[in-house]
Amino acid sequence: MQQIKFIDLFSGMSGIRKGFEQACRKQSVACECVFTSEIKPAALEVLKQNYPDEVPYGDITKIETGDIPDFDILLAGFPCQAFSFAGKRLGFEDTRGTLFFDVARILKAKKPKGFILENVEGLVTHDRKDSTQKIGRTLTVILETLEALGYYVSWKVLNAKEFGIPQNRKRIYLTGSLKSKPDLSFETSPSPKLKNILESGLPTESSPFIKKLLKKFPPSELYGKSVKDKRGGKNNIHSWDIELKGAVTEEEKQLLNILLKERRKKNGLQKIGIDWMDGMPLTKAQISTFYKHPDLQNILDSLTDKGYLVLEHPKQKIGGQRIKDESLPKGYNIVSGKKSFEINKILDPNDVAPTLFAMDMEHLFVVDNGGLRTLTGKEGLRLFGYPDDYPFDIPKKDRCDLLGNTVAVPVIKAVSERLLHTL
């Protein structure tokens, strides 16, 4: 039986390792992880639970290549970081100061047979000059660096929902071999439904917010609904729809629904000397051009007192940030944004989950037992293709953080199989 040694960098929950090991087992290839690197405490605890006989190394930037055992395959899910270009393109040296540099320096020193890298979809266009470019400078330098090291490199954006996972999660996968280019063309399968991985009959949560929500909407009508004030659409619920901050009249509700759209338009903003921003506060005079009501000021005052609106100065864009410009008159703006409520979205069991991010995981709910609850740890693992028996005994907040940053294990398995064919 063939024996393959591999290393796992930026290991996180070891999702890339899991997928690679599954591919090896499927192809009757013996494999051994000879080196793991991770620095996040919660991830280290999970690694300890899963691999009690192993001791992960710490910060990869501080580890000399001579201290890393020889290996055949490098696995890494590295962060997306821009490179610094000063004058002449230097290839490998252009990557210095980023974590990809450490991936490259290890590949250069150890010359393994191949590698698998995973990153966010945004890496494809990261740091490009304009929209006419297919890929940005960051990915260009990465590919040039890997090819200069002698690897035949393939890359592709793949979606987890096409590999048996009920989550719409696109990521870029790069894989390379010293012998030949791995084939990353796959036959996709129909997306499974979220209900296939959900548990049932579990305790639900109760809070003033949830009580108000369920008072206005039966659970079955909440499937796929988002809760945020600064966007519209049929799948969105606003705080005023459930009277979260106090009762609203029909006139007040009508104004709020119109205002949330008008505040995003560019009309007339140049006249007040400000660049357009997504969500501009509008003065009473501006509002009166699209909402004519004899009692407009009282309506605005009422909504401001209840907390649905805020009276604030417009903001100028300065150094990449929005800073309020007190030289301009105050206007009325919607108060609550996407992350203002304990619920961000109620998942639709008959659909796939949206892309799951660390910051959103705690605010995703499902309908169960006539009420609402958050995802369980087991459901979270299933949404990324981890086995049910995967040890994951850490606080909920840490679970959400690790899951939001992990990989879809079945996609890694599929990519790994293609790499193994080239060895």
Curated annotation (Swiss-Prot):
It catalyses: a 2'-deoxycytidine in DNA + S-adenosyl-L-methionine = a 5-methyl-2'-deoxycytidine in DNA + S-adenosyl-L-homocysteine + H(+). SUPFAM superfamilies: S-adenosyl-L-methionine-dependent methyltransferases. This is Type II methyltransferase M.NgoBV. InterPro entries: C5-MTase, C5_DNA_meth_AS, C5_MeTfrase, SAM-dependent_MTases_sf. The active site is at residue 80. GO terms for molecular function: DNA (cytosine-5-)-methyltransferase activity; DNA binding. Belongs to the class I-like SAM-binding methyltransferase superfamily. C5-methyltransferase family. It holds the Pfam family DNA_methylase. Residues 4-423 form the SAM-dependent MTase C5-type domain. It is an enzyme of class 2 (transferase). Its EC number is 2.1.1.37. NCBIfam families: dcm (TIGR00675). It comes from Neisseria gonorrhoeae. It comes from the Bacteria. One of its GO terms (biological process) is methylation. Keywords: DNA-binding, Methyltransferase, Restriction system, S-adenosyl-L-methionine, Transferase.
